[in-house]
Amino acid sequence: MTQQKQTQSYLVPFIIMVVLMALVGLITNLNGQFQAPMQAAFLQKSGSLTNALTTLITFAFFSGYLAMGIPSAKCIEKKGYKKTLIIGLFGLIAAFGLYELSAYIFETVDLEKFQAEVADPNAVIIPVAYYVFLLAGFVAGSAMTFLQAVLNPYIVACDVKGTTGVTRQSIAGTANSTMATIAPMLVASVIFAGKSGLDIALSSLYIPFLVLIVLVGGLIVALMNIHLPSIASAEKKEGEVLEKSVWSFSHLALGVVAIFMYVGVEVCIGNNINLYGQSLGFKPEQAALMATIYWSLMLVGRLCGSFLSSISASKQLLITSTGAGVLVLASIVTNNPYFLVGAGLFHSVMWGAIFSLAIDKLGKYTSAGSGALMMGIVGGAILPLVQ
C-alpha cells in the first residue's frame, strides 16, 4: 500500500515534466522557425550580410548551451535538481519578456525609419530590435540548458504505476517531438498568418508569448508546492570531492562530440530548410510544411524508437547514423532537399542513444557529465553558421 501511494504521488510531477519536455520542443523550434519571418522583418536592408545575420538567430540561442553547460551542472551540485529547474523556468520567462520587448521596439522605434529607407537601394539598416531578439534567443537557450540538465533524470525518477523509466522517457519524448512538429506551422500560419516582409506585424508576438509567460508562471507555482523524487544517487554528496575531471571519461568526451554533430545537423536541416525552400521559390507556408514534415518524421521515429528497448544503444546509434548519412549524401548528389527531410526519421533515435552511452556508469559524476553534454548542444549554433 505504501509503495502504491508513493507511485501515485509522482503522477502529477511526471505530468509536469512531460509538459516541460513539450515546452522545450516548442521553444527550441519556435526560435529556429523565426529565422525566415525575422529575416523578412528585420534584415531586408542588411545587404550581403542578410543570410549570416539570419543564422545568428539560431547561433545566439544555441550559444546559451555552451555558456551555461558547466554553470547548470554546478547549480545542480549546489542547489539540487528542483531549484535548478525553477531557475531555468524563471530564465525562460525573462526570455519571453525580451522577445516581446524586441517586437515593441521594432513597432515603436525602428519601423518608421525602416519604412523611410526601404526604397533606397544603397541603404543598410539593422534595427535595434534585431539585437534585442538575439539577446532573447541567448537567454532562452541558457534557460533551456538548466531545464534539459534536470528533466531527463526527473522523468526517470518519477515512478508512475504501470510504467518503466523507458516508457516514461518515450512519453516525454513524444510530447517533445509533437510540439516541435507543430512549431513551424504555428509560426508561419498562426502567428504571422502567412505574411512576409514589412507586412509582418511583430505585434503578433505579444499574445503568444504572454500565454507562455502565464503557463510557465503556473508551472513554477506548481513545482514549488509539490514533492519531487530524490535523485541523490546521481549527485555529488555535500563535501564530497570529485577526484578527477569529468573529461577523463573517454565515452563522455565522445558523447559531447556526438551531441555536437547530432544537434548541429538536426538544426541545419530543421531550421535552414525553411530558408532553403524559400530560396527555391516556395511560399512561406510551403517551406514551413517541409520543416513540419521533417519534425513529423522525427515524431514517427520517436514513437518507433519506444519499441527498440531490446536493441542496445550502441546498435541503435550505428544504424540510425548510417541511415541519416546515406540520406544526406543522396541529397548532395541529387540536389533534392526531400532526402534531407527524410533524415528526421533517423535523427529522432540518436539523442537518447548518445545520452545513455555518454553518462553510463558515471555515478557521482553524472550531474557534471550532463552539464558537459549540454555544452555539446552548441553544435546547433556553430554548424548552421558554417553552413
Residue ranges of predicted features:
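Extracytoplasmic
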Residues: V12-L43, Q148-N152, I269-G277, L383
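Extracytoplasmic gate region of multi-pass secondary transporters
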Residues: N31-A36, S245-T292
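Extracellular/periplasmic helix-loop-helix junction of adjacent transmembrane segments
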Residues: F34-A67, K113-D120
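Central cavity-lining transmembrane alpha-helices of secondary-active solute carriers
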Residues: T55-K74, T292-C304
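Helix-to-loop junctions at the C-terminal end of transmembrane segments
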Residues: A67-Y81, I191, G301-A313
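C-terminal ends and interior cores of transmembrane alpha-helices
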Residues: F90-I125, G323-T334
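Intracellular juxtamembrane helix-capping segments at the cytosolic ends
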Residues: F146-V160, S348-T366
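Helix-loop-helix hairpin linking two adjacent transmembrane segments in secondary transporters
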Residues: G165-H227
